[in-house]
Curated annotation (Swiss-Prot):
Stated name of the protein: Chorismate synthase
Obligatory cofactor(s): FMNH2
Alphabetically ordered keywords of this record: Amino-acid biosynthesis, Aromatic amino acid biosynthesis, FAD, Flavoprotein, FMN, Lyase, NADP
Molecular function terms from GO: chorismate synthase activity; FMN binding
Signal peptide bounds: none
Catalytic activity: 5-O-(1-carboxyvinyl)-3-phosphoshikimate = chorismate + phosphate
Free-text function comment from the UniProt entry: This reaction introduces a second double bond into the aromatic ring system.
Lineage: Bacteria, Pseudomonadati, Pseudomonadota, Betaproteobacteria, Burkholderiales
GO biological process: amino acid biosynthetic process; aromatic amino acid family biosynthetic process; chorismate biosynthetic process
Amino acid sequence: MSGNTLGTLFTVTTFGESHGPAIGCVIDGCPPGMALTEADVQLELDRRKPGTSRHVTQRQEPDQVEILSGVFEGVTTGAPIALLIRNTDQRSKDYGNIAETFRPGHADYTYWQKYGVRDYRGGGRSSARLTAPVVGAGAIAKKWLRERFGVEVRGYMSALGEIEIPFVDWSHVRENPFFAPNADIVPQLEDYMDALRKDGDSIGARIDVVASGVPVGWGEPLFDRLDADIAHAMMGINAVKGVEIGAGFASVAQRGSVHGDELTPDGFVGNHAGGVLGGISTGQDITVSIAIKPTSSIRTPRRSITRAGEPAVVETFGRHDPCVGIRATPIAESMLALVLIDHALRHRAQCGDVSSATPRIAARAPDAQ
């Protein structure tokens, strides 16, 4: 399994399985001299951890992070940073009934066909549990980006199933378990999830992520374009089946006279490009949306096959998220931050001394509609 590392200069390699003794990651390339404590990382992990509301898995994992290396006297040294998160609430017996059967919609069948061996306990390596160390690494990336460039990476749930969630204010996001930017709609979301759980079914979600303050110039054409790497990272999140940058698929129905973001001396007039042109950041907000599929682990009986190829019926029991999108916001934020810090370092390495006589215009013109 050779695809466990993300990044070029700032790299993150994750390890562990859902029901193993621990999960974690090794971060290489973090700049030295940044103040860092376990509490800095824990703040982000607490936003993602399970068991925080009745609408998510009731697996009770404290997700307490340990920094094993790369930090001395509270400061990063430039050496690899190892983060460890111990698993404490595994219930492997819940998965005994699927040891010989493939769960529809999961990685069971493909992992078995590719590797010839499968850890069926909670999905093993393919579990969304492995997003915890990604969030830990993302906490470090977000801190460096904020302190070095003033970049803020924030996200929110913009749709739960067929329920669209109009954006009201960022302050609402941290006040509810859905990361919804609209407090008035939360009771409707709660009723929706309660009915879904009663039916033994699941649903998908859309998450929007915004990075503000990214300078113009980040991105490495042709094949490491900033938006290409963002899409690559977002598709590495469990259950993500679609990624949009800026207007995304809405661009199909837009005319060039609408979609093209005009430039004026006072700033850009629009941001349909989502903050990236030619694979390089424009200085505008980078806007990303991801589509998350419904959880495959549901109580409704589903047809499948056994390892011997015989027909079978699968009913999934245990502790599962009826919508994995509810906890996906900090994960998507972390992925975007990891791509941005990597490109910040790559830009500094090759083009740090480049200057242009053309003034850098504002992210948005004052009179832009």
